[in-house]
Each structure stands twice: as structure tokens, then as C-alpha cells.
Amino acid sequence: MTRTITPDMTDDDLLEATLRPKSLDDYVGQEKAKGNLRVFIEAARGRGEALDHVLLYGPPGLGKTTLANIIACEMGVNIKSTSGPVIERPGDLAAILTNLETHDVLFIDEIHRLSHVVEEILYPAMEDFQLDIIIGQGPSARTIKLDLPKFTLVGATTRAGLLSSPLRDRFGVISRLEFYTIEELAFIITRSARILGMEIKPEGATELARRSRGTPRIANRLLRRVRDFAQVKADGVITLNVVQDALALLEIDHMGFDYMDRMILLTIIDKFGGGPVGLDTIAAAISEESDTIEDVYEPFLIQNGFLNRTPRGRVATRAAYEHFGRIVPEPPQGKLFQD
């Protein structure tokens, strides 16, 4: 059973949940992380123990929440889901922990956003399965230890570097999720289309995968939008031409760049001479949060060689200039003699 301790989900969230695989066998990609988890889960089940605490990190949309739910399904236990910003006070976390049952999975998304005070409650809970409760105030205050059922904490984060060392060290399993290949995404898109009762041609699935930035969440989102286009203008069949026409209207180019990707790169190239330029300066220039640029847009641009992150700031690469048809500037020549 899944219990979500977060605000109500939207219709798109509910639809996204129906597309998620329910077992490791159905989960596509992330072979290294999946293979390790399969071994750890089988070993824990064989010993009749709770799975060790798991930290999943990587760019958004790669399947961290899906893996957390699969872990619970494979272990045959309940999962309770929440997120770091929702847990504002130690009492909030204490209430969640005391309602867990033996071997339950507690999933905390954006775990890097837990406050330091809340983290302090987690340390003994993760290590000793105990909750330290302070009764009274001032000199008469005393601490009692409340035993907790053995549970598995699954934490997800896009910014593992922001986790404190004491918290990170308490995770027994740490897995990084990588961007997906075009072949993996095409398989996911075909599977999602089948679940949604849609007909999609192989070349249409491949083209959609190519423009999905290596991210299943984006692939499924674009699939839903292309489905609308196919339903209205193409008899409900998703072909290569349908995908190309629909994504042209959505301003998604052949590399998967959307409006914001183009804004980031063109701002660096046209306004700041290709860089280096600071992240906060870019954010101010395009009216976007610096955290959003760093977490959502930069990983894809950097991994695909369009952006460099240097100590002095962000720099557009030769590939970025060529993508937009800009002339690549010549590197400055050093002077032989000083004036």
C-alpha cells in the first residue's frame, strides 16, 4: 500500500503514476543501480530483514520515485511518501516515524532540503531505530528513547552534494541514476503508448526519444502532448511526421532543446560573449531561479557538451555556437611584447 504525505496530486501526476513500472523486471534502464538493488533486496528478504537505507541521486525525472515504490513492492511492504520541504518541524518527522510498521519504506523526496534540526531526529532513527524525545523544559527536561520498528529510508535528491556528511554516511546503499539512451527511451515510450491505448510507429517513438533529453518524465510528458495532436489531426496514429509537426509547435528542436535551453545558451553567447559568466547573472538575465537552471537545465547541457562549468562561470562550447549557427570566436592571442 502507498500512502502519500504530500499535497494532492494533479491529473497529470495521476496519469504519470499509471505509466510507472511496478517491478524491477518492468523497469527499463539504470542497469547498474537496478542490478545492485536486485541483489540487496533478495538478500534482505532471504534474511527476513529490512533493506538497508537507500539514497538515490541524479537529475530530475530519471525514476527515483519510481524506484522507491518498486523497492517497497519487491520487499512486499508498505511505502509512505513525503518530501523534505513538507517536514518543517521535528514533530512532523516524529509523527511519521511512529506510524511506520515493521520493514516499511519511508520515501523522502528532496531530502537535501531537510532542516538541520529535523536531520538530528533522523540520525538515531536510521542507525539505532530509536527516537529521542525531550520531555519538559529547562533544568527539569529529560530525554527518553522510543523504539521504532526496523524500516528502510529511501532518500531522493538532485543535489547529493548538499547532504550533510552524517546523513549521507548513514545510507548503506547509494546509487546514482544516469540519463537514458535513445533506445531505452523509445522502449519506455512504446510501453507508455500501449498503456494509454495509442498506436505509435517505431520511427515516431525513436524521434520522440531523441528529443526527450534522456529523461523518461519528459518522454512521457511529450508523448501525452503528441497524443493530443495525433488525436485531432492524424487519426490517432503517432507517426514520424506527427511527432515532428507536434514538437515543432511545442518549440522542441531536434536536440530536445526547449525555449529555456535556448534562452540560457543564447544569453551566454549573445549577451556575454560566450562566457565565462556567473550563474546568478544568467538567472537575472533570463528571469529564472538559479537553482532551477542548475538542477533542471544544466545537467543535460553539460553532459551533451553544450556548456562548460568553470571556476570563473559558465562557458558556451563550440557545439553550442554551431547548433545555433553562430560563428565560433577565435581564442585570444597572447602578446609577445607588453605595451
UniProtKB/Swiss-Prot annotation:
Listed SMART domains: AAA (SM00382)
Annotated region described as Small ATPAse domain (RuvB-S), given as residue ranges: 181-251
Known catalytic reactions: ATP + H2O = ADP + phosphate + H(+)
GO cellular component: cytoplasm; Holliday junction resolvase complex
UniProtKB keywords: ATP-binding, Cytoplasm, DNA damage, DNA recombination, DNA repair, DNA-binding, Hydrolase, Nucleotide-binding
Keyword flag Hydrolase: yes
Spans annotated as Head domain (RuvB-H): 254-339
Annotated binding of DNA, by residue: 309, 314
Pfam families: AAA_lid_4, RuvB_C, RuvB_N
Signal peptide range in chain numbering: none
GO molecular-function term, one example from the UniProt record: four-way junction DNA binding
The keyword RNA-binding is assigned to this record: no
Annotated ATP binding sites: 19-20, 61, 64-66, 127-129, 170, 180, 217
Chain segments carrying region Large ATPase domain (RuvB-L): 1-180
Origin: domain of life: Bacteria
One BP term from GO: DNA repair
Subunit comment: Homohexamer. Forms an RuvA(8)-RuvB(12)-Holliday junction (HJ) complex. HJ DNA is sandwiched between 2 RuvA tetramers; dsDNA enters through RuvA and exits via RuvB. An RuvB hexamer assembles on each DNA strand where it exits the tetramer. Each RuvB hexamer is contacted by two RuvA subunits (via domain III) on 2 adjacent RuvB subunits; this complex drives branch migration. In the full resolvosome a probable DNA-RuvA(4)-RuvB(12)-RuvC(2) complex forms which resolves the HJ.
Job description of the protein: The RuvA-RuvB-RuvC complex processes Holliday junction (HJ) DNA during genetic recombination and DNA repair, while the RuvA-RuvB complex plays an important role in the rescue of blocked DNA replication forks via replication fork reversal (RFR). RuvA specifically binds to HJ cruciform DNA, conferring on it an open structure. The RuvB hexamer acts as an ATP-dependent pump, pulling dsDNA into and through the RuvAB complex. RuvB forms 2 homohexamers on either side of HJ DNA bound by 1 or 2 RuvA tetramers; 4 subunits per hexamer contact DNA at a time.
Domain notes: Has 3 domains, the large (RuvB-L) and small ATPase (RuvB-S) domains and the C-terminal head (RuvB-H) domain. The head domain binds DNA, while the ATPase domains jointly bind ATP, ADP or are empty depending on the state of the subunit in the translocation cycle. During a single DNA translocation step the structure of each domain remains the same, but their relative positions change.
Name of the protein in its database record: Holliday junction branch migration complex subunit RuvB
Phylogenetic placement of the source organism: Bacteria, Pseudomonadati, Thermodesulfobacteriota, Desulfuromonadia, Geobacterales
